[in-house]
């Protein structure tokens, strides 16, 4: 006998609570299946295997059935008792069934004429006809969203109440799309159009000298690397001046960044060495059809790059002519003494040593000399402050680290003196390698030999280190640029003075004077 609706609503579930919780299929043995709506098996196969408690719950009454029963009870109370029941159930009556009947619009596949002449759509389009309360169809469309910072970042931006707009703009969807496309394609600040911004992004980054896009055969590669090195030297100089390193404690000396100075000197040496390497020049013979046999040749023609001295001497003949013309105009007849006979016809335009690269080499070498002077000045202050304190013989360096630069053996009994001597040796080796890459003699040795003839108030004497300034002077005269040709020599003289002072302090503090 089939069960009643009440029994069906509260019947047992077909799966136990444990299987429903784990979302597993609840299987029951054939001999333990449901025999009736009120009878449940003892255990399912999963609970029996896990030795867990198996509970079969009952179904809750459906919500739609409960709501329909409540509606029927409330409607039945509102029906007029004088209306006969037979008249209420007629299809043309105005009772419960006719008042709650919903006429759906035609399907999309129907004819458009039926949609136009439908009574439902006529009532919806006719605003003068009183209608029953219906759902607001305008709620299905997106509300007007103001396209401003207030609505987009209201929770993240702290905006004053006076700056908020008093009226809310109402943009249509087309206007919102136009404003969004205009904002996404607007050029950056400071540029008139998008082409300038794209052209700026295509320019190489000078700060990245190790970019894989740069080639060694590219003429601009040397300029970019030298510009990056010059920027690094000036930043190191600025950091050493801004940061206050204590010269009275060993900890302040240990934290002094001489590694940056060594890196700058070693990088300068490697860059100048790369500029002196032979340059490969390929001769291309292109026919009418555009065939280039040099691109498929495995043995391109190569020419050796002349040295820095030979390259400048090759262009002295033309420089001499320009200098003589300038001296006739200005009345300076002493420019002729700087010129020398030309022994070669190689042009600077055929090599990588063009005028901007020579200028950058000169600036890097001069800036590196100033950086060394500031480092040695700090070492002098450290040794002066150390001489005023009592010596602590708590650190004994190994035997291989006690050799000196020029004085033989030094019995260093202090940690500060050992660090200064070690740093001085490393820095001088790197600086002499930088001078050797330029083809110059050691300025420390040459200027030291002439130091007896140089006084503190007199002008520094001209030494062999003026060979670089000699060539640079001719190059700069060609470009109509004037500069102090003895500025670098004065810097090197100051550098030698600092080195001699450091050596003298080491002699005095170790009893070797």
From Swiss-Prot:
Major site of localization recorded for this protein = nucleus
Q: What is this protein called?
A: Varicidin biosynthesis cluster-specific transcription factor
Q: Which GO terms describe its cellular component?
A: nucleus
Residue ranges of the DNA-binding region?
16-54
Please report the organism this UniProt entry assigns to the protein.
Answer: Talaromyces variabilis (Penicillium variabile)
Q: Where in the cell is it found?
A: Nucleus
Q: Where is the composition biased (Low complexity)?
A: 67-76
Endoplasmic reticulum among keywords:
no
- GO molecular function terms listed in the Swiss-Prot or TrEMBL record: DNA binding; DNA-binding transcription factor activity, RNA polymerase II-specific; zinc ion binding
Q: What job does the chain carry out?
A: Transcription factor that regulates the expression of the gene cluster that mediates the biosynthesis of varicidin A, an antifungal natural product containing a cis-octahydrodecalin core.
The ranges of region (Disordered) come to: 58-92, 97-116
Protein keywords? DNA-binding, Metal-binding, Nucleus, Transcription, Transcription regulation, Zinc
Compositionally biased residues, Polar residues: 77-92
